[in-house]
Amino acid sequence: MIELKEVVKEYRTKNKEVLAVDHVNLSIRAGSIYGVIGFSGAGKSTLIRMFNHLEAPTSGEVIIDGDHIGQLSKNGLRAKRQKVSMIFQHFNLLWSRTVLKNIMFPLEIAGVPRRRAKQKALELVELVGLKGREKAYPSELSGGQKQRVGIARALANDPTVLLCDEATSALDPQTTDEILDLLLKIREQQNLTIILITHEMHVIRRICDEVAVMESGKVIEHGPVTQVFENPQHAVTKRFVKEDLNDDFETSLTELEPLEKDAYIVRLVFAGSTTTEPIVSSLSTAYDIKINILEANIKNTKNGTVGFLVLHIPYISSIDFGKFEKELIERQVKMEVLRHG
């Protein structure tokens, strides 16, 4: 279990004080993948660096497996950092070292005998899919391969927690998915707790169990990914979901002809088993109404599927619309009225 209790990080300059992290409270289950998402300047990079005390909190507590990180001795903190490892956006590899020697580097620092360190590094090379590239230098590798080296190096000391600081933001979409699949595989094999920060909802949706959304140093929304994706509460969260859906329908609404009286345009959100049920056709039959599908989208999260539909109902009485809405609620389908004639 990892806990953040009232964590604050404040930077002081001659002219002003900057509150980078503002009274953050989080609980992260051991063995889970926890995502932190926010736009630039939200405070997420500062936050992740407090898990291993690369940044010391101004106040508050960071507790990992019962250890209060800020209360550890210098030697205790050094030992803890071996178990709370980190990968970076720009890889941070040693360019004068080969793939194998980059992975061996943290083992050398830890005083592991050379033969054992080499054997461990070779195992990690195979784990991350770089067998045959042991003698290559970073300049000879693609971005995805460099990040694989970074991941292998981070695993060298058998950590229990892996911190990912924008680990895929420098990669193309296909390579991003390959790295995310690798992180999932490693989590399953080694029972790691993974904490990642990103500005991409796709990354959160694809591998995370839970997510926290940050803005101006605060956590403004958090919860299971499917729940947050299905029913975002804060404007920032809604923007991330909208971008992931590539949804510009609300902009298109302004170009539509005025609706007739008793006509509606609604958005439905389905989750789980309801995404495969013929709800629209059954409701159309039950209420003897025409329903036009204007837009449809299905997104997979790590723990389930979320579906989105935008519907045009040319005519439905207010009484029937109330019944229509009630039946959707009973079927656990959320509805938002976008326009009403």
From Swiss-Prot:
Keyword flag Lipid metabolism: no
Domain ABC transporter: 2-241
InterPro entries, A to Z: AAA+_ATPase, ABC_transporter-like_ATP-bd, ABC_transporter-like_CS, ACT-like_dom_sf, MetN_ABC, MetN_ABC_transporter-like, NIL_domain, P-loop_NTPase
EC class name: translocase
Amino-acid positions noted as binding ATP in the UniProt annotation, renumbered to this chain: G38, F39, S40, G41, A42, G43, K44, S45
A GO MF label: ABC-type D-methionine transporter activity
Subcellular location(s) per record: Cell membrane
Assigned EC number: 7.4.2.11
Keywords: Amino-acid transport, ATP-binding, Cell membrane, Membrane, Nucleotide-binding, Translocase, Transport
GO terms under cellular component: plasma membrane
Pfam families, per database record: ABC_tran, NIL
Membrane topology value: Peripheral membrane protein
Reaction catalysis annotation: L-methionine(out) + ATP + H2O = L-methionine(in) + ADP + phosphate + H(+); D-methionine(out) + ATP + H2O = D-methionine(in) + ADP + phosphate + H(+)
Function: Part of the ABC transporter complex MetNIQ involved in methionine import. Responsible for energy coupling to the transport system.
Family: Belongs to the ABC transporter superfamily. Methionine importer (TC 3.A.1.24) family.
Subunit composition and interactions: The complex is composed of two ATP-binding proteins (MetN), two transmembrane proteins (MetI) and a solute-binding protein (MetQ).
Protein's UniProt name: Methionine import ATP-binding protein MetN 2
Gene expressing this chain: metN2
